[in-house]
């Protein structure tokens, strides 16, 4: 009897596409207006001086300058700013 029984169905075999989140420009790097600094879900980093936030919480430079990361406030919030070089 050279027959093969039907294989059972599997519940695996799927995976979502990666979203490429994270820091795109690091502290001390020169940046132009409109460049993306951080792609994130929620406000892991908050916008500081010279930085805007998109509707998906992406942080981007509003002015040309140098990226600066800092921790401020009683809650230890992390802020990203752009300071003019």
From Swiss-Prot:
The keyword Electron transport is annotated on this UniProt entry: no
Positions of the UniProt region annotated as Disordered: 1-21
InterPro entries, alphabetized: Ribosomal_bL27, Ribosomal_bL27_CS
Pfam families reported for this sequence: Ribosomal_L27
GO molecular function, one term: structural constituent of ribosome
Keywords of this entry: Ribonucleoprotein, Ribosomal protein
One Gene Ontology cellular component: cytosolic large ribosomal subunit
Biological processes annotated in GO: translation
NCBIfam families: L27
Family, similarity comment: Belongs to the bacterial ribosomal protein bL27 family.
Protein name (database record): Large ribosomal subunit protein bL27
Encoding gene (name): rpmA
